[in-house]
UniProtKB/Swiss-Prot annotation:
It comes from Rattus norvegicus (Rat). The phosphorylation status of Ser-90 appears to be involved in dynactin-dependent target binding. Residues 88-97 have a biased composition (Low complexity). This is Cytoplasmic dynein 1 intermediate chain 2. The gene is Dync1i2. Residues 1-13, 20-43, 190-209 have a biased composition (Basic and acidic residues).
Amino acid sequence: MSDKSELKAELERKKQRLAQIREEKKRKEEERKKKETDQKKEAAVSVQEESDLEKKRREAEALLQSMGLTTDSPIVFSEHWVPPPMSPSSKSVSTPSEAGSQDSGDGAVGSRTLHWDTDPSALQLHSDSDLGRGPIKLGMAKITQVDFPPREIVTYTKETQTPVTAQPKEDEEEEDDVAAPKPPVEPEEEKILKKDEENDSKAPPHELTEEEKQQILHSEEFLSFFDHSTRIVERALSEQINIFFDYSGRDLEDKEGEIQAGAKLSLNRQFFDERWSKHRVVSCLDWSSQYPELLVASYNNNEEAPHEPDGVALVWNMKYKKTTPEYVFHCQSAVMSATFAKFHPNLVVGGTYSGQIVLWDNRSNKRTPVQRTPLSAAAHTHPVYCVNVVGTQNAHNLISISTDGKICSWSLDMLSHPQDSMELVHKQSKAVAVTSMSFPVGDVNNFVVGSEEGSVYTACRHGSKAGISEMFEGHQGPITGIHCHAAVGAVDFSHLFVTSSFDWTVKLWSTKNNKPLYSFEDNSDYVYDVIGSPTHPALFACVDGMGRLDLWNLNNDTEVPTASISVEGNPALNRVRWTHSGREIAVGDSEGQIVIYDVGEQIAVPRNDEWARFGRTLAEINASRADAEEEAATRIPA
């Protein structure tokens, strides 16, 4: 408080000093203006002054007029006041007629005579009384004064019309001081102003106390500013641009062999954070539909850091070459699934091991959830392995499903209780322990799920047949991943889906047949996830426990993958996700690392005839399966 009062007193002293300077400035300005007006008056008087002879001439004329004499007499007033020619003996000029008229006007007064001195510089007027005659009686004469007004000169100047706003006088005076040309400042005043400025600049800044520093560091404004600024600085520092790149093609010629060798799959980025990713397993991946460069990854607990939060969700940015996550979210239970809220670009949804569903908002400065579902029997009580937002911009819901067989529908605005819930049960048996779920493109009612028992089920949310519809058997182990056909083209393949399992296989299915269409058996470990390309009808990807990523193009080959690559260190790959463009693919491993690969154009970009070719491939697969079933049927009787 003492610092504030001292600062306030210092400001008051400066204000008083400024007021004194302004008053002194105003007084000196008034003195200067007064001096200028006096000088102008003196100049006008000096201009009007005339020579002594001219003054005497005017006095003489006035005196003559007062005596009744007119200037029409033969006296000529020249430049040097030379009298008219006279005889050498004469010393005076008389006007008898005028004298007579004067006598007639006044009998007591004698005639008057005007006498001139021979010296033209001195004009002397002698009356008759000086010559021994009677005194002269003076009378009043009328003077007519005529004023001629000066000629009016009209001038025009161009101006810019601007709206006039009423402001306080103090503001106007300050603006005038700034805008109007300043009069020359006296050296003393200038020195005082400079001295004050130097004192202000040299004054040491106020040193904050530890309490004030902590208060600033923990303020919401500082945290928001620091978070935003560090994110921008990291992006700038992480950019790596090759300034020596040769556009003439020499660089490409040197690397032609490397480009052709790695054209199918090439490493793009790696995401790993020492604090939040280390010793954690990547449990789920999802790309943002609003911002295609953002990837959310969920992680389970870190057993070596018991004091850290069990569940973590990190948002990574593909656009900038920064090595730290864009956002860090966490909660008190391991996050088993995560997704971007499709129609809410700021929201991230997570499903936890405890059965809670949590909601994070990147507009909030908090890393903890802004909403969460209750831990009650009305919601989930088992781990939530699947969360998905389905619907349209104006009508959408969050769908969650857990290993207790319960599927819930939620509104993102209110997670206090589900809008709808249903238990998935097949033929009055126990509930299905769901491990994976997928919706066909454009469908919000029908979906497929994989279970811990190795069976696949089709189900629907609404209608008379709500619940489990059909069961598909073929896997010999728990289902780890399931995905419906997502590529939209000339032919509709939405009835197809692929599954992965602990039985080391990937299988292709159709909802029209409860037996697998084809089984891909090229892996030698658990296959943890599988997903179809969003743009290519015959392309899908899968990952296994040996750290291998396989890309299968069924139009090229159904026996071996079209492209394969192993992650360095061969960690188990838990999750795989295509970008929305289908040009990159992300994989997450058991050590908390996420690797992004670029997919070659010859694989990722479909040609116009890919849908027709895939139709023929399916026909061949169905024919081969029919032949195999017929051959198996003939073997049984034998």
